Amino acid sequence: MKRTRLENTPCPAGRALDLIGDWWTLLIVRDAMRGISRFSEFQRSLGAAKNILSTRLKALVAEGILKVEPAADGSAYQDYVLTEKGLALQPVLVALGQWGSEYLFDEGEACTLLVDNKNRQPLRKIEIRAQDGRVLESQDITAIIPEV
């Protein structure tokens, strides 16, 4: 079955998933946030086939999520570096990871924990807040399409 493209939907989540919804793509962004920058490092970390990894990296560069720079160590390699647009995905990955650790691991099962570098304490759970600071639940939110 052919996948439906969502690039023209008025739903921001649909458009975002159209771009980054593939799990290899999000794992590449996750690894880039952890400091991985070379093709070989991504491949070693992810175990992705070279053609899949190459296709995903090219797409992330084309969409402005990653940029290609000369290797920081002066070698002939190139580094894939997150752009501002790519770095803006951090809350998405943190929220996804927090959801996964809460719902997809058994009690006592080893699970990666995100901690604050300064004090080594776990991150607080991401919350959705109103303009006035109130924490919002799903029933407190409505999606609208503003008139243009």
Stretch-by-stretch model annotation:
Residues C11-I52:
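N-terminal helix-turn-helix DNA-binding core of bacterial DNA-binding proteins
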Residues G21, A72-L93:
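Basic, amphipathic "hinge/linker" alpha-helix immediately C-terminal to the N-terminal HTH DNA-binding motif
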Residues R34-I36, G86-L87, R120:
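Short, charged/polar surface micro-motifs in flexible loops or helix N-caps
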Residues V94, Q98-V148:
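C-terminal regulatory/oligomerization modules of transcriptional regulators
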